[in-house]
Amino acid sequence: MRIVLLGPPGAGKGTQAAKLADKLGVPHISTGDLFRDNITNETELGVEAKRYLDAGDLVPSSLTNALVEDRIDQDDAKNGFILDGYPRSVEQAEALGDMLAARNLSLDAVIEFRVSEDELLSRLKGRGRADDTEEVILNRMKVYRDETAPLLDHYRAELKTVDAVGSLDEVFARALQALGR
């Protein structure tokens, strides 16, 4: 299965992606991990990404798209993948659609993990990260809302919404149900 996971910071995407990847036998592809791996291994794309990150700039979509395209072409992703943290914009969603279409593939599902802002604030403040001040958290949630609302509309046909409040196992069961598993 080829799945995209959407949801605000603190919704549990990474945790659920790992569980789904294990259950479905496909790789969990996180753009954060892709950047780290390519930078650590000093690949051509990693060296280029590092220049932007070191300057405190956003990595351009074209570079992120290239990293994702390279990753989905690897053998372990031939039967599917779970994307976490990508796409983040309609532009990236269209690029992903083009990548898949060029391989005669398409997405099987897009899952949105939905959590109230109060619950997210509570979760993120409870993580104890230095950069998780209420102001920073609220800004990250606003950025997510502003960027993601158009994505939810873009993926309307494939979109499955999952209530992400509850135990890890409860949310996992809902995600599997959304996938018809």
From Swiss-Prot:
SUPFAM superfamilies with a match to the protein in the record: P-loop containing nucleoside triphosphate hydrolases
User: Reaction(s) catalyzed by this protein?
Assistant: AMP + ATP = 2 ADP
UniProt keywords, alphabetically = ATP-binding, Cytoplasm, Kinase, Nucleotide biosynthesis, Nucleotide-binding, Transferase
Region named LID: 126-132
**NADP in keyword set:** no
User: Pathway listed for it?
Assistant: Purine metabolism; AMP biosynthesis via salvage pathway; AMP from ADP: step 1/1
Which Enzyme Commission number(s) are on file for it?
2.7.4.3
Q: Does the keyword Transferase apply?
A: yes
Kindly list the positions annotated as binding ATP: G10, A11, G12, K13, G14, T15, R127, G166
Broadest EC class assigned to this enzyme: transferase
InterPro entries from the UniProt entry: Adenyl_kin_sub, Adenylat/UMP-CMP_kin, Adenylat_kinase_CS, P-loop_NTPase
Please list where the region (NMP) is annotated.
Answer: 30-59
Q: What are its GO biological-process terms? A: AMP salvage
Major localization listed first in the record, in broad terms: cytoplasm
User: What domain notes does the record hold?
Assistant: Consists of three domains, a large central CORE domain and two small peripheral domains, NMPbind and LID, which undergo movements during catalysis. The LID domain closes over the site of phosphoryl transfer upon ATP binding. Assembling and dissambling the active center during each catalytic cycle provides an effective means to prevent ATP hydrolysis.
> What is the role of this chain?
Catalyzes the reversible transfer of the terminal phosphate group between ATP and AMP. Plays an important role in cellular energy homeostasis and in adenine nucleotide metabolism.
Quaternary structure per UniProt?
A: Monomer.
Q: What is this protein called?
A: Adenylate kinase
Q: Which species is this UniProt entry from?
A: Mycobacterium sp. (strain KMS)
Supply the source organism's classification: Bacteria, Bacillati, Actinomycetota, Actinomycetes, Mycobacteriales
